[in-house]
């Protein structure tokens, strides 16, 4: 599919800004809608002189007012409250942003004749896992965040069947990399690094034996570009991960070595509601269908965080 104009919601944020980087490098005229609640214009500053970037401050629900009659070929929907803990403490807010806002964006896409919609879903749709997650397994989310992402996936299937909108769902696992924001709801890698750099003791929820599948943001971008370009992607869900298992205890050890803080002891606290013990992806489908090949290994990828 030939792409001349793309919209990235949440395009000033961690993952969205990296997608913008790749689109601009491909010569795609790129529109960004972001309310800057977690994103920053610093993430887009390198594109000011390109003539290809158009930034609009606002909510994705305002897409019609912001874009007017601009013709868009593909939408990358990255805007969300991406936090399991926040969905537990504020379920109605997270549902409104992650589900209701997406529905309004989908309605815009149908009215405006958008060809393809690439959705940032999540491994949280699976719930409690005992082995590698495969896309055809039953999803039983154990958090409001995961339930919301799964609800949107169902809507995307319905919009494809009803209106012909080409939809692709990318189930991100634990994403890390440059520009990841540090806050209470950040990814665990960013939290550990910042805590150790401040001389504090990193906090591990549970026993630290939880297994995660960490994937670098560059590989997330690769998956998004394949989702944009491949006819085989339409109507499909794909795990996006590295396929490599890392325990939280092993992660703490690696991060301590990286920042030169081996002498700082970590501390344990009870597990949080909605957290899972095991989170590892099967990569078979995305490799076979899209040719996805994760490039960044953790030791090298952490150095750029």
PLM region spans:
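Residue-level signal for the nucleotide or nucleotide-sugar donor/cofactor binding architecture
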Residues: 39, 61, 89, 97-100, ...
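N-terminal Rossmann-like NAD(P)+-binding domain of SDR-like oxidoreductases, especially those catalyzing
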Residues: 1-175
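Short alpha-helical functional segments enriched in proximate histidine and acidic residues
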Residues: 22, 26, 108, 195, ...
């Amino acid at each position: 599919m030939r792409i001349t104009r793309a919209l990235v919601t949440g395009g000033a944020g961690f993952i969205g800004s990296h997608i913008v980087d790749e689109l601009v490098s491909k010569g795609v005229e790129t529109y960004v809608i972001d309310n800057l609640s977690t994103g920053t214009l610093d993430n887009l500053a390198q594109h000011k002189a390109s003539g290809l970037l158009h930034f609009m401050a606002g909510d994705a629900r305002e897409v019609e007012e912001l874009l007017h009659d601009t013709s868009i070929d593909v939408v990358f929907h990255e805007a969300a409250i991406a936090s399991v803990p926040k969905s537990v403490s504020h379920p109605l807010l997270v549902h409104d942003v992650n589900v209701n806002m997406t529905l309004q964006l989908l309605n815009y896409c149908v009215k405006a004749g958008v060809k393809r919609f690439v959705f940032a879903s999540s491994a949280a749709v699976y719930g409690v896992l005992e082995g590698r997650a495969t896309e055809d397994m039953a999803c039983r989310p154990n958090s409001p965040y995961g339930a919301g992402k799964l609800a949107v996936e169902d809507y995307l299937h319905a919009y494809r069947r009803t209106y012909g909108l080409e939809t692709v769902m990318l189930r991100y696992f634990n994403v890390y990399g440059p520009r990841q924001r540090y806050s209470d709801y950040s990814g665990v890698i960013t939290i550990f690094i910042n805590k150790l750099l401040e001389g504090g003791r990193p906090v591990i929820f549970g026993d630290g034996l939880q297994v995660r599948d960490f994937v670098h943001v560059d590989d997330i971008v690769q998956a998004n570009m394949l989702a944009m370009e491949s006819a085989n992607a339409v109507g499909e869900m794909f795990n996006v991960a590295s396929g490599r298992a890392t325990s939280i205890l092993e992660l703490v050890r690696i991060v301590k070595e990286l920042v030169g803080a081996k002498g700082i002891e970590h501390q344990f606290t009870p597990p949080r509601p909605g957290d899972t013990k095991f989170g590892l992806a099967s990569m078979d489908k995305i490799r076979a269908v899209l040719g996805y090949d994760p490039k960044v290994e953790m030791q090298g990828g952490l150095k750029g965080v």
